[in-house]
Amino acid sequence: MTDTRRRVKVYTLNEDRQWDDRGTGHVSSGYVERLKGMSLLVRAESDGSLLLESKINPNTAYQKQQDTLIVWSEAENYDLALSFQEKAGCDEIWEKICQVQGKDPSVDITQDLVDESEEERFDDMSSPGLELPSCELSRLEEIAELVASSLPSPLRREKLALALENEGYIKKLLELFHVCEDLENIEGLHHLYEIIKGIFLLNRTALFEVMFSEECIMDVIGCLEYDPTLSQPRKHREFLTKTAKFKEVIPISDPELKQKIHQTYRVQYIQDMVLPTPSVFEENMLSTLHSFIFFNKVEIVGMLQEDEKFLTDLFAQLTDEATDEEKRQELVNFLKEFCAFSQTLQPQNRDAFFKTLSNMGILPALEVILGMDDTQVRSAATDIFSYLVEYNPSMVREFVMQEAQQNDDDILLINLIIEHMICDTDPELGGAVQLMGLLRTLVDPENMLATANKTEKTEFLGFFYKHCMHVLTAPLLANTTEDKPSKDDFQTAQLLALVLELLTFCVEHHTYHIKNYIINKDILRRVLVLMASKHAFLALCALRFKRKIIGLKDEFYNRYIMKSFLFEPVVKAFLNNGSRYNLMNSAIIEMFEFIRVEDIKSLTAHVIENYWKALEDVDYVQTFKGLKLRFEQQRERQDNPKLDSMRSILRNHRYRRDARTLEDEEEMWFNTDEDDMEDGEAVVSPSDKTKNDDDIMDPISKFMERKKLKESEEKEVLLKTNLSGRQSPSFKLSLSSGTKTNLTSQSSATSLPGSPGSPGSPGSPGSPGSVPKSTSQTAAITTKGGLVGLVDYPDDDEDDDEDEDKEDTLPVSKKAKFES
């Protein structure tokens, strides 16, 4: 079907009382067997699919609005609308609906909107039509009472609306308004306020078209200035005529479009500023007013898009060097308002809108505008850019990659955005925060497209790290040339925090691009300089950046961290924080706890070998002692690979397997008695029977002897130690300024009687520094007392020692056979 008269858009009203566009198609009417009646059918013009199939129900209230709209409710809270391209098509379908319902096509509504009680309906139907009082000054109070009394009843509202419409009553009321103002009749003006407000609540399109006409709308606004609850009238008309003057920056040749823009602005002003807040009214009382504004906006955007001369002139003047600054500012502000206007459109309409702007060259125009000195113009251009990025980031990426082939890095659009972020003069960096959000959207791989021939992620990130990343990190590198930030004022700290936030996002999402950049440019070392900042939020941003890197558990990063000794700034910050329980203390402990729990072997060894002296006295959490235990276990396995192999056998391979298999093997083990042993040998898997018994049993015997000795020492320590609760980290530690690994600590707290002193050789029997059992038992008893460290995971400690504990749970007969 190619008849444009029947071309329509289908809309549904969502939960937020906004209209959603369901598609464009052609409407027809006909009998549908499945629905058993005449129905409205809309088929999509793109593929012929069925957009709407709605039976014309004899009892459904259909409304005709603005000559080209038909609105109705299918069910509770499900409103539909057909917006016709031409009035003739709307009239044809309206006649068909009225024919089915047996109504006169001259009416604008076919049924009462809300059912009433039978008694009330009978009374109203038996009474004659509503008779309005004569429109005179002396009867304004009576008219106001009539309007107020009609609002609760839908049928009375309908009768009142018809009477007002048929008698041209609104224009008569507005004539009285002029008389009251001339006579300064305040009482009469107060009555007119109540009358006009009540007419809005009638929710009638035909009345709105009269009230919002060019000759009436300012008088309607005038009536609404005289709110009886206010001591002085508002000056809405003065604002609209003097302050909010319409500036036609580009001549609009279409008078209908110009009138529609004026009308929409004023009606929007009435809705937002003049009428009381919507919460005062019953739900849906102003739904027709919302619809009136919405469809006006759709129409305006469509008319502007179709006016190619208007848009061509707009962009030509924007980029013309001869355009004076005041004119350019007006043009940019108009374009900004135009884009803001489009946000009310549905996705399909917005798609066409931004595609039109793109074809007209909006991005090159923005690039020119952003390079100008006028801060107001640049600010408006930034807002326009944000609309484009939010709606279609791929379009922006494609543009910046294409221009990189022709222009230097300094004048690339994305680099201009970064420079404006860095150079934001606002003390609160409001503009910088907005721009950082836009950059984050542009570099987010989640909204990048992938096709068979090319991947936008690979291409754009390659471009970004080659042409733009050095601009983003410039303030960071400039401020971290020494051991502490060269500038540490609040605004600089805020800016660097924004840069770090974006870099942290890149670490999480960009894999090898950011990895190569960090390692090649030594970025992490520079970032950790900021841990010496006096601003805690900046130091925490730097720590968060490192924590994100460690969280990846990437050995390339780990080797870089160890090679450059990049735990030193963190340990320094931890020690300088002293005994304060704050976010810095918790965040640092959490980072080391992550290394322990995840058993990152390389970092565990690096931390203990280089920083144990500084951390060994931290006993209010078990994190660092747990790290030391991990380290000793690693070294023990390295020194005794055969012991490690045997232990894995005794642990039943330690790692979690199928639960049923595990239970069967445990049952076999514990059901085995001495008769199952041959010549005092342990039962091992057949693959291990070929091993030399002495090679296996000798280290086991030594291990059991050391274990017994440790347990006896630990019992003595526990008996002497006061387990009254968690100790406060009231230690005083100093840092020497020698080599990077020369971190020393000194405890100001007196050692507990019998507590371990400085650690000796971890591998020697009975070494005071090797007390894993004491550590875990102390932690367990403290937990029973109800006090737990800031970042303390006793369950993890139990898991670490679980396998050693299993040996103690073996039957006595089996222990004897191992020790014999």
Swiss-Prot record:
| Residue segments, region Disordered | 670-699, 720-820
Q: Which domain of life is it from?
A: Eukaryota
* Residues modified to N6-acetyllysine: 642
Q: Name one Pfam family in it.
A: PP4R3
Q: Where is the WH1 domain?
A: 1-100
Provide the protein's localization: Cytoplasm; Cytoplasm, Cytoskeleton, Microtubule organizing center, Centrosome; Nucleus
Q: What GO biological process terms does the UniProt entry carry, in alphabetical order?
A: gluconeogenesis; positive regulation of gluconeogenesis
- Could you tell me one molecular function GO term of this UniProt entry? protein phosphatase regulator activity
Phosphoserine: residues bearing it: 117, 127, 685, 728, 755, 758, 761, 764, 767
Which InterPro entries does UniProt cross-reference here? ARM-like, ARM-type_fold, EVH1_PP4R3, P4R3-like_central_dom, PH-like_dom_sf, PP4R3-like
Q: Spell out the GO cellular component terms annotated for this protein, sorted alphabetically and separated by semicolons.
A: centrosome; cytoplasm; cytosol; nuclear speck; nucleus; protein phosphatase 4 complex
Q: Where is the composition biased (Acidic residues)?
A: 670-681, 793-807
* Keywords associated with the record: Acetylation, Cytoplasm, Cytoskeleton, Nucleus, Phosphoprotein
**Polar residues composition bias: residue spans:** 721-752, 772-781
What does the function comment of this entry state?
A: Regulatory subunit of serine/threonine-protein phosphatase 4. May regulate the activity of PPP4C at centrosomal microtubule organizing centers. The PPP4C-PPP4R2-PPP4R3A PP4 complex specifically dephosphorylates H2AX phosphorylated on 'Ser-140' (gamma-H2AX) generated during DNA replication and required for DNA DSB repair.
Please give the subunit comment from the record. Serine/threonine-protein phosphatase 4 (PP4) occurs in different assemblies of the catalytic and one or more regulatory subunits. Component of the PP4 complex PPP4C-PPP4R2-PPP4R3A. Interacts with PPP4C; the interaction requires PPP4R2.
Q: Which family does it belong to?
A: Belongs to the SMEK family.
UniProt protein name: Serine/threonine-protein phosphatase 4 regulatory subunit 3A
